[in-house]
Amino acid sequence: MANLFIRKMVNPLLYLSRHTVKPRALSTFLFGSIRGAAPVAVEPGAAVRSLLSPGLLPHLLPALGFKNKTVLKKRCKDCYLVKRRGRWYVYCKTHPRHKQRQM
């Protein structure tokens, strides 16, 4: 969801960067100082995409998987057991990190 939102916000900027000349201040900000003579990116939108690289974006939706356990335990009062596809699972609505799967 956040990835889609960011793409919707950045795509117009990428489109504009192909057809207009960037102001000197913005190009200096994106490509470093002019004295450093940093090579300009070949692709028109590469500078904007480099600002949105995965290392710079906050991790908004961490993907937490199941902990594989031989013996399942309810870790709080809201944990509950479910049997699906021949395995037992522990789910918790208040603490999603309590999710467990029987090995």
UniProtKB/Swiss-Prot annotation:
SUPFAM superfamilies associated with the record: Ribosomal protein L36
Keyword terms, alphabetized: Mitochondrion, Ribonucleoprotein, Ribosomal protein, Transit peptide
InterPro entries: Mitoribosomal_bL36m, Ribosomal_bL36, Ribosomal_bL36_sp
Pfam families the UniProt entry points to: Ribosomal_L36
Molecular functions per Gene Ontology: structural constituent of ribosome
UniProt key word Transmembrane helix: no
Subcellular location: Mitochondrion
Single GO BP term: mitochondrial translation
Annotated family: Belongs to the bacterial ribosomal protein bL36 family.
Assembly mode: Component of the mitochondrial large ribosomal subunit (mt-LSU). Mature mammalian 55S mitochondrial ribosomes consist of a small (28S) and a large (39S) subunit. The 28S small subunit contains a 12S ribosomal RNA (12S mt-rRNA) and 30 different proteins. The 39S large subunit contains a 16S rRNA (16S mt-rRNA), a copy of mitochondrial valine transfer RNA (mt-tRNA(Val)), which plays an integral structural role, and 52 different proteins. bL36m has a zinc binding site.
Protein name as annotated: Large ribosomal subunit protein bL36m
